[in-house]
UniProtKB/Swiss-Prot annotation:
Residues 242-533 are annotated as: Catalytic. NCBIfam families: thrS. Homodimer. Belongs to the class-II aminoacyl-tRNA synthetase family. Disulfide bonds: none annotated. This is Threonine--tRNA ligase. The gene is thrS. Its cofactor is Zn(2+). One of its GO terms (biological process) is threonyl-tRNA aminoacylation. Keywords: Aminoacyl-tRNA synthetase, ATP-binding, Cytoplasm, Ligase, Metal-binding, Nucleotide-binding, Protein biosynthesis, RNA-binding, tRNA-binding, Zinc. It catalyses: tRNA(Thr) + L-threonine + ATP = L-threonyl-tRNA(Thr) + AMP + diphosphate + H(+).
């Protein structure tokens, strides 16, 4: 007789085998109607799976995060059901969930059009209205194989052929349509009501460009229509904030086919880049980092010694000269060890913090490239700290402070922290991993920070802390990281002399705050919608005259401001002042300075902001107080 323990600690004893559906019904009709799956001893199961043993149970509904994911997965199967009804010759591949949605990869002789997408969506709605039961059946591998052979589904057959013999497989039956999945799925289509098909794109089978190009139908699904509407609104706002559109409108940068994944920075965009670089350089200097510069191309032998060649050679750009093969560096760490290795180091010299604005190249797939967010050439705010084991925790603790200081300067106050622990494939002893993970966790705990584990997601050479920003649309961007590395110093023979006069390998901490300048600027463009804080704005001030008579005074003011180090432009076009104000407001310039006969006579300037605030006529000295305060705040809006 199974004894079931509920989340509140209540225990219920049942006379025989039961299901999640039975337990939900025993608790009450409301829960029975809302239940879509269950969690049995932390494992998600369908509500119809029998339980004949003692277990801790949680009923999953659409209010749970897992419930929404199950709903999305079930919608992927509904795509399959609808497509097979409308296009019987289509062959179904895979249909997993992704962030905020799901997709299904399909092989079909004709290209799906927007009209086809609308037709599929309508058929899904018709199927939902039928309120049919989704039936799960656990079958042998051979039965599953024969099922999909009979249904002429070659991709399903290929998947099953890669499953070991003797394994069982779950089949999910949507009336006449059958799919396979680990599950769980909703028990009835009545739980599926808030969705939208988003788009169709191409995708290679198994992500391999040597395989067939399939058609991928993307969709999103939510627990209710309110959440769906909120998501669509966020997408529309994100579309307006697309850094590629704003970048073009503000003349910040462009990319082109002749240099895929490489950024052409325009003067306005390069201005932002330079301000960002100067700020980070000042922060590093204030925290006792030493800036270095290492070569772009390094002989293959160094990458083989470091271990990067075996793991990343397909992602490297290479070149040959005089019968030697070089890799354009994809990261900076092996080169920083070469600098550390020049000259004998003592424990008294540690920690040594080497920083570089390192230009790196990685051969990302062309289909993955996306404006500034995913590029092939990028600059990291990279640094490596060489320290003793005893110094690891304090160095990590100091870096955490640094990360929060920098992010706050851009207005990011909500930081998500995760500690990635040892993966299955790793180097180093369990003792070293225990010590490394403990040092990172204690550094986080000493700050009183909320954080969570990412089990098994550490690098092969050591655990890491990841810092992610949440932007104004509640999107999460992983940017900063600090990683403990006991492996590379050993591989590349880094040594220092310890207190006993013996040679010892330093611990190496890999760390970055922004991640890459390109991606971080892309994040800033979208977060600010191009309305950069004054300290970052490409043009901080525009000076305009009302008539030609005011040109000389405008030129003099512009020169004064430029000489004081501000970024200023002069507009003496023969246009109406209202037209110029509107144009420069749309161009997101923070301060608009206007000089007419009255201002010139009184020795004042009329000041307007891009938000439309008319600050009246004030002296230059008064304006500079306002301007300097705005700049000093950086992006700290709190």
């Amino acid at each position: 007789m199974p004894i079931i323990t509920l989340p509140d600690g209540t225990k219920k004893e049942f006379s025989g085998s039961i299901t999640i559906a039975d337990i939900a019904s025993d608790i009450g009709p409301g829960l029975a109607s809302a239940a879509i799956a269950g969690k049995v001893n932390q494992d998600l199961v369908d509500i119809s799976i029998p339980i004949d043993y003692d277990a801790e149970i949680k009923i999953i509904t659409a209010k749970d995060k897992e419930g929404v994911e199950i709903i999305r997965h079930s919608f992927a199967h509904l795509i399959g059901h609808a497509v097979k009804q409308l296009y019987p010759d289509a062959k179904m591949a895979i249909g997993p969930i992704i962030e905020d949605g799901f997709y299904y990869d399909i092989s079909y002789s004709k290209t799906f059009t927007p009209e086809d997408l609308a037709r599929i969506e309508e058929r899904i709605k018709d199927l939902i209205k039928l309120n049919y039961d989704v039936v799960v059946e656990i079958v042998s591998r051979d039965k599953a194989l024969n099922t999909f052979k009979d249904r002429n589904e070659p991709y399903k057959v290929e998947i099953i052929n890669n499953i070991p013999e003797g394994e069982t497989i779950k089949l999910y039956k949507h009336q006449e349509y059958i799919d396979m999945c680990r599950g769980p799925h909703v028990p009835n289509t009545k739980h599926l009501n808030s969705f939208k098909l988003m788009r169709v794109s191409g995708a290679y089978w198994r992500g391999d460009s040597d395989n067939e190009m399939l058609q991928r139908i993307y969709g999103t699904a939510w627990a209710n229509k309110k959440d769906l509407k909120a998501y669509i609104n966020r997408l529309e706002e994100a579309e307006k904030r697309d850094h590629r559109k704003i970048g073009k409108k503000m003349d910040l940068f462009h990319t082109q086919e002749e240099a895929p994944g490489m950024v052409f920075w325009h003067p306005n965009g390069w201005s932002i880049y330079q301000v960002l670089e100067k700020y980070i350089r000042d922060v590093l200097n204030n925290n006792y980092y030493q800036e270095v510069k290492t070569p772009q191309a390094v002989d293959r032998s160094l990458w083989e010694k470091s271990g990067h060649w075996d793991k990343f050679k397909d992602d490297m750009f290479t070149t040959t000269s005089e019968n030697r093969e070089y890799a354009i560096k994809p990261m900076n760490c092996p080169c920083h060890i070469q600098i550390f290795n020049q000259g004998l180091k003592s424990y008294r010299d540690l920690p040594i913090r080497l920083a570089e604005f390192g230009s790196c190249h990685r051969n990302e797939p062309s289909g993955a490239l996306h404006g500034l967010m995913r590029v092939r050439n990028f600059v990291q705010d990279d640094a490596h700290i060489f320290c003793t084991e005893a110094q690891v925790q304090s160095e990590v603790s100091n870096f955490i402070d640094l990360v929060f200081e920098v992010y706050k300067s851009f207005g990011f106050n909500e930081i998500i922290i995760k500690l990635s622990t040892r993966p299955k494939k790793r180097v180093g002893s369990e003792f070293i991993w225990d010590k490394s993970e403990k040092a990172l966790s204690e550094a986080l705990n000493s700050k009183g920070l909320d954080w969570s584990y990412l089990p098994g997601e550490g690098a092969f050479y050591g655990p890491k802390i990841e810092f992610s920003l949440k932007d104004c649309l509640n999107r999460v961007w992983q940017c900063g990281t600090i990683q403990v590395d006991f492996s590379m110093p050993s591989r590349l023979e880094a040594k220092y002399i310890d207190e006993k006069g013996e040679k010892k390998e330093p611990v190496m901490l890999h760390r970055a705050i922004l991640g890459s300048f390109e991606r971080f600027i892309g994040i800033l463009i979208e977060n600010y919608a191009g309305n950069f804080p004054v300290w970052l704005a490409p043009v901080q001030i525009i000076v305009m005259g009302i008539t030609d008579r005011n040109s000389s005074c405008c030129e003099s003011l512009t020169t004064k401001l430029i000489n004081k180090g501000y970024r200023v432009k002069l507009d003496l076009r023969n246009e109406k002042i209202g037209f110029k104000i509107r144009e420069h407001t749309l161009n997101r310039i923070p301060y608009l300075l206007i000089i007419g006969d009255k201002e010139e006579k009184e020795g004042k300037i009329a000041v307007r902001t891009r938000e439309g605030n008319d600050m009246g006529s004030i002296s230059l000295e008064e304006f500079l107080v306002i301007l300097n305060k705005s700049i000093s705040l950086k992006g700290r809006f709190d």
